[in-house]
């Protein structure tokens, strides 16, 4: 029997935990002189799923996670690579809603390589 996911559940505590955990990783990295570069998460709601309530909720949460990432980058004066904005949402870049094709992965690598080479 397939379980149904309740899309009305409150996920805000999860976002707080996400932010807290990321801040801990940032703190540990910086204390150990490890340079930190943050990146936003890409999601692509292709035509077959763009109106599905569960996928729309997942996208909403990912967008809020990306805001947390932006906030932490600003708070900690870190480089942020906004891949969610830099990589176009099109089938040539995504196998599904969250996994890149080889072309998409190349674009992701290029985004990070450019920033790493500048640092």
Give names to the regions the model predicted.
Residues 18, 79, 93-119:
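Histidine-centered active-site loop/cap adjacent to the catalytic His
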Residues 1-71, 75-76, 83, 88-91:
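Serine-dependent acyl-ester chemistry module
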